[in-house]
UniProtKB/Swiss-Prot annotation:
InterPro entries reported in the protein's UniProt record: ATP-grasp, ATP_grasp_subdomain_1, D-Ala_lig_Van_CS, D_ala_D_ala, Dala_Dala_lig_C, Dala_Dala_lig_N, PreATP-grasp_dom_sf
Domain of life: Bacteria
Residue ranges occupied by any ATP-grasp domain in the UniProt entry: 132-342
Keyword Iron-sulfur tagged: no
Keyword terms of this UniProt record: ATP-binding, Cell shape, Cell wall biogenesis/degradation, Cytoplasm, Ligase, Magnesium, Manganese, Metal-binding, Nucleotide-binding, Peptidoglycan synthesis
Gene name, Swiss-Prot/TrEMBL: ddl
Natural source organism: Synechocystis sp. (strain ATCC 27184 / PCC 6803 / Kazusa)
Official protein name in the record: D-alanine--D-alanine ligase
Amino-acid positions noted as binding Mg(2+) 2 in the UniProt annotation, renumbered to this chain: E309, N311
Record note on cofactor: Binds 2 magnesium or manganese ions per subunit.
Catalyzed reaction equations: 2 D-alanine + ATP = D-alanyl-D-alanine + ADP + phosphate + H(+)
UniProt binding sites for ATP: 168-223
Length: 354
């Protein structure tokens, strides 16, 4: 079966996508997978231009982005001719224009199966405000939050102080300010007072027109659970992230030695069971498919578990949390990649799931 491995993309998570694609390509080259799949890599430059398998393989081999050249709008409509021959796609594009329903819409339009959630699940999984509304409707406990529009921050200086007062009254300090549609903790800030709030809102507005402000919790443990499947998804063991920084920001995530994964997490069995149940509930609530990583906060002093977010296309390097959780659950990396491709054929190959 001909598999298109799509990576790179126009988001700030371009380099992470390359690393994920390298790991997936290696897994597809395993003895068992080589007999099933013929892989062709396709790299999307930061300027949005698709490159064919020959150059894309060079990017995989070198592990660094391909140099961009000035392009016209018409060049972004040109796809490598080899793309038309792919029977199933494995998109590993992180962030905007990759896991937000855009490329999923393209594949759906072309009526070709692909790994991961469909357009709806991807959209809801990317937009933190929409996601929280869906979680709320599903009865999943969350931290207190409120949504903010860029226009409330930039358009009228007289409105801005009133907005800050509203946030202080409804959410309070400490709180986190986040762009609604970015991943990997890009643009996120922890704030403790009015001056930090003003700066964080201004910064978040430079990334997105929709911003979310969430209440901060104290004495929490950050735990994660991986989900695999379509209509009858399974939950992995639960893992925990620890770090020395103030919060789990971009630098902490992607700097060696700044954070540690503990798999499985040292948690009471009842807590693990509850997290796994909530993970599957959240996965279904957003209409996810194939894979998803669910992030939670656990407060040992109160026993409270609240859902933070779902990532419908999580990092997929050899040492990323998602594959590591499944490895600890008895599913090795090559088998995981194989199962995801089979789930794609099962889900997106049927009517009503495009």
């Amino acid at each position: 079966m001909r598999v298109g491995l799509l990576f790179g993309g126009c988001s700030g998570e371009h380099e992470v996508s390359i690393k994920s694609a390298q790991a997936i390509a290696k897994a597809l080259a395993s003895d068992d997978n080589q007999t099933k799949y013929q892989v062709s890599p396709f790299y999307i430059q930061k300027n949005g231009v698709w490159l064919g398998p020959d150059v894309s393989q060079q990017v995989l081999d070198q592990g660094v982005p391909w140099g961009d050249q000035p392009v016209t709008a018409g060049q972004r409509w040109q796809f490598p001719p080899e793309a038309a021959r792919m029977e199933v796609w494995f998109p590993i594009l992180h962030g905007p224009n990759g896991e937000d329903g855009t490329v999923q819409g393209l594949f759906s339009l072309m009526q070709v199966p692909y790994v991961g959630s469909g357009v709806l699940g991807s959209c809801v999984g990317m937009d933190k405000l929409a996601m929280k509304m869906v979680f709320e409707r599903a009865g999943l406990p969350q931290v207190n939050y409120m949504g903010v529009e860029r226009g409330e921050i930039w358009s009228n200086p007289c409105v801005f102080p009133a907005l800050c007062e509203k946030i202080e009254a409804q959410v309070g300090y400490p709180c986190f300010v986040k762009p609604a549609n970015l991943g990997s903790s890009v643009g996120i800030a922890k704030v403790r007072n009015r001056s930090e709030l003003e700066a964080a809102l201004d910064n978040a507005a430079s990334y997105d027109r929709r911003i979310i402000v969430e209440a901060g919790l104290t004495d929490i443990r950050e735990v994660e659970c991986a989900v695999l499947g379509n209509e009858n998804p399974q939950a992995s063991v639960v893992g925990e992230i620890t770090y020395d920084s103030d919060f789990y920001d971009y630098e902490t995530k992607y700097t060696d030695g700044r954070s540690q994964m503990h798999i499985p997490a040292n948690l009471p069995k009842a807590v693990v069971n509850q997290i796994q149940t909530m993970a599957i509930q959240a996965f279904k609530a957003v209409d996810a498919a194939g894979l998803g990583r669910l992030d939670f906060f656990y407060q040992p002093t109160t026993g409270q578990i609240v859902i933070n977010e779902i990532n419908t296309l999580p990092g997929f390097t050899a040492f990323s949390m998602y594959p590591e959780l499944w490895r600890a659950s008895g599913v090795e990396f090559p088998s995981l990649v194989d199962r995801l491709l089979q789930l794609a054929l099962d889900y997106h190959g049927r009517p009503g799931h495009q």
